[in-house]
C-alpha cells in the first residue's frame, strides 16, 4: 500500500489502523438494545460467544488490540470512549431488565469480556494458560461453557 494513499485517505498510518479497529471492533459496533427478560440469558451468552468468534477469526484485530494498548492518542481515546459508552448502555439495559444490580453486571461483564480479549491475544502467541491451549477449539469451548455457567447463575 502506498504511503501517499494512506495519508490522502486516512491522514496517517495510525488513523488507518484506528479505522480498521472502529469497523471491526465488537464492542464499538454492538447494538445497544436488548430483548426482553425471557431472552436475556441467551442474549448475554450469544454476546460473549460472538466476541470469542470474532477474535478467533480476526487475527489482525488481535494484533491491533495489542498495538492499541501501547499508544495513547485522540483516535484511540475515541475508540475507547465508544466501547465504554456502548458497554455502559448494555449494562444499564441488562440490569434494568434482569433486576440484578448495575454494579454486579458491570463487574461480571468486565471480567468476562476482558478475559476473552486477553486469552485471544495470549492464545495468538501460542501460550498455554492454566493448562488450556487457546489455539485449540476445545479450550475455547471450555471457556464458553464456563461463561454460560456464570451467566446462568448471574441472570
Q: What kind of feature is each model-predicted range?
A:
Residues 1-15:
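Helix-turn-helix
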Residues 31-57, 61, 100-112:
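Hydrophobic alpha-helical connector segments
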Residues 28-34, 73-99, 106-110, 141, ...:
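Amphipathic alpha-helical packing segments from all-alpha helical-bundle domains
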Residues 94-148:
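Hydrophobic/aromatic-rich alpha-helical bundle segments in the mid-to-C-terminal region
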Residues 53-89, 133-137:
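Short secondary-structure transition hinges
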Residues 21-28:
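Short, basic, alpha-helical segments at the C-terminal edge of helix-turn-helix-like DNA-binding modules
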Residues 43-57, 139-155:
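N-terminal hydrophobic signal/anchor transmembrane helix of membrane proteins
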Residues 17-19:
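Short, Lys/Arg-enriched C-terminal cap helix and immediately downstream tail that follows
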Amino acid at each position: 500500500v502506498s504511503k501517499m494513499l494512506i495519508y490522502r485517505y486516512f491522514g496517517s498510518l495510525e488513523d488507518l489502523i484506528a479505522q480498521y479497529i472502529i469497523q471491526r471492533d465488537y464492542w464499538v459496533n454492538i447494538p445497544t438494545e436488548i430483548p426482553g427478560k425471557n431472552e436475556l440469558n441467551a442474549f448475554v451468552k450469544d454476546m460473549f460467544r460472538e466476541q470469542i468468534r470474532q477474535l478467533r477469526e480476526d487475527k489482525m484485530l488481535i494484533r491491533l488490540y495489542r498495538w492499541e494498548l501501547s499508544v495513547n492518542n485522540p483516535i484511540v481515546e475515541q475508540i475507547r470512549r465508544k466501547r465504554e459508552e456502548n458497554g455502559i448502555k448494555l449494562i444499564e439495559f441488562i440490569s434494568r431488565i434482569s433486576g440484578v444490580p448495575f454494579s454486579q453486571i458491570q463487574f461480571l461483564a468486565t471480567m468476562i469480556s476482558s478475559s476473552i480479549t486477553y486469552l485471544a491475544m495470549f492464545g495468538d502467541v501460542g501460550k498455554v494458560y492454566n493448562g488450556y491451549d487457546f489455539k485449540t477449539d476445545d479450550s475455547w469451548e471450555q471457556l464458553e461453557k464456563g461463561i454460560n455457567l456464570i451467566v446462568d447463575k448471574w441472570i
